[in-house]
Structures are given as C-alpha cells and as structure tokens.
C-alpha cells in the first residue's frame, strides 16, 4: 500500500497541468490570444486578467508544493545515505526551480520581461538539472532503494532527454523567429517537467508519515527513533 505522501507529487502534476490548460482555454475564449496567428507561449496566455490572476495562483501553489516535495526528497535521500554535498546540490536546484516557477507566475512577461525570463530559466533549465542529478545519483549509487517497477528508471531517462532537447529547441527556434513551433516545444517541455515531478510519487510510495522535530537541547527529550517508512525533518 502506498503512503499518503505519494499523493503530493501526483496532486502537483494534476494541479499544474489542469491549471495551465485552464489558463490557455480562458485566453482563447477571451480572445487574449489568436490561434490563427500561431500557437502562443504559456506566458502570453497568462499576460492579462482574468487569466493572469489564475496563472499566478496556479504557479504559486505549484511552486510551494514543488519546494515541499524537494525538501521531503532531500531528507529521504539523506536517510538513504546520500552524501550531504551531493544531496544539497540536488535540493538547491529543486528549490531554485520552484522559485523560478513563482517568479514566472508573478512577473508577467509584458510587464517585467527580464525578471520573467530569469524565472523561466530557473523553472525550465534548472528544473531539468534537478531530475538529471537524481538520475545520475541512482546510476552512480547502485545500492540506493529503487521503488517502483523496473521501467521507471528508463522512463525517467526518456522524459529527461526529451525535455532537455525540447528546451534547447525552444530557445533555438525562438531565435530563428519560429515562435509558434518554439511555443509548442515550451508547452510539451512544461508538461514533461510536471510528469517528472508526478513520478516522484513512486519514490514516496514507501513513506507513510513525516515528523517535524526541533533540535534537542541539553536536558530536552530526544526526537522519536527513525523508522524506515517515516521522515524526521529537524528544524
């Protein structure tokens, strides 16, 4: 039986995918974008109200959920014996991805282009680095637990490769003024990133609790003993 924490990545993926396409639908209905002129970038769909308000809310909640997932993953990898420096690099790339997602949602492209593009870089390119680092870790440390079916690892490799190729294609095609094709690459890359976050549900399938513990001082009670199916996050 899967623990309830596995619902968090799945909910994030569903929330983000459904939310982004809702923004797209509203932009089309409200004529904020014209599909006859070409397929729009995600940011263009969320440029003006009311869809810009929904866009911000969707990405803010998604960013907060992603940050919490990255923190849980950090402590899970720590309990599996991953080196601290490697684990911290993975954590910070994930948190930067979450930060970039929030920046994209709150700084619309038409108002703060430079800030918006910085957030997009963090969300897309640093985000895919987060998953590449975890793939490298699972390949390098064969003794790490590998929850889920044997095909989960190859699936992640395919998704990471496709996402990275699409992100590079997005930038190159944009520079060649092939905006519509570039936008399609952006949409597909975003969906793949959401799916990669959703696949972390497999890694969280063995977790059934998460306990926050204060650092014990002299004479204070010690935190409860570790359990293989629980995380103890020290503050």
From Swiss-Prot:
The chain crosses the membrane at residues 9-29, 52-72, 89-109, 117-137, 157-177, 181-201. The keyword Glycoprotein applies. It is found in: Cell membrane; Endosome membrane; Cytoplasmic vesicle, Autophagosome membrane. Residues 30-51, 110-116, 178-180 are extracellular. One of its GO terms (biological process) is autophagy. Pfam families: Frag1. Belongs to the DRAM/TMEM150 family. Modulator of macroautophagy that causes accumulation of autophagosomes under basal conditions and enhances autophagic flux. Represses cell death and promotes long-term clonogenic survival of cells grown in the absence of glucose in a macroautophagy-independent manner. May have some role in extracellular matrix engulfment or growth factor receptor recycling, both of which can modulate cell survival. This is Modulator of macroautophagy TMEM150B. It comes from Bos taurus (Bovine).
